Design a protein with these regions (language model features):
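SAM-dependent methyltransferase catalytic region
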Residues: 1-134, 155-169
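C-terminal substrate-recognition regions of SAM-dependent nucleic acid methyltransferases
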Residues: 136-180
């Protein structure tokens, strides 16, 4: 119903966006009364937390910028480019309430399990992972993605106690896998 939709948009959704173009798109979709802060998620925390009067979340969804100041990755690294997507994931995990969920779409390099971020993720329940190789990632983003493998993953903010569902591209189905 329209009443329920309005309640969800005005009382349950909070967005932080730095780009005015993207803010305008969100307002076109959700209306002018959407809770959206024109802020830098990482560097203006006090601003958006004050605007929303909230500092913990039940669910966080994101497709953060992967780099700033250019492209960085296998085969290409622009001078001055810095990878930043991991900072968004790391900070979002800190903002989750106990038993809250975090769903992100990022490069899949964390799945090599070598980084501090990967170690932090492994302390949580990884519910689901789906990987996209370079070719499929490129198609998925309508040929606008860089040449890197991507994945989306759902993390529950509690201790790992169950197997993780991993999408098997060969069999086209989710399989249970014990990551820990």
């Amino acid at each position: 119903s329209e009443k329920r939709r309005t309640h969800i948009i005005q009382n349950m959704l909070y967005m932080v966006e730095i780009s005015q173009i993207n803010i305008n798109k969100c307002k076109k979709i959700f209306g002018d009364n959407v809770n959206i802060s024109k802020s830098d998620f990482l560097n203006e925390t006090t601003k958006w937390q004050t605007e929303f009067n909230i500092s913990e979340f039940n669910i966080i969804l994101g497709n953060p910028p992967y780099n700033i100041n250019g492209m960085k990755g296998k085969g290409r690294s622009d001078k001055g480019a810095t990878v930043i997507w991991g900072k968004f994931v790391d900070y979002s995990l800190d903002l989750l309430k106990t038993n809250g969920y975090c769903l992100f779409f990022t490069p899949n390099s964390w799945t090599e399990l070598k980084s501090p971020l990967a170690k932090k993720i492994l302390t949580k329940q990884i519910v689901l992972i789906k990987n996209f190789d370079v070719v499929n990632a490129y198609k998925l983003f309508d040929k606008k993605a860089g040449s890197l493998p991507l994945c989306y993953y759902l993390i529950k903010n509690n201790k790992p106690s169950k197997k993780t569902l991993i999408y098997d591209n060969l069999f086209n189905k989710l399989i249970d896998f014990d990551i820990n």
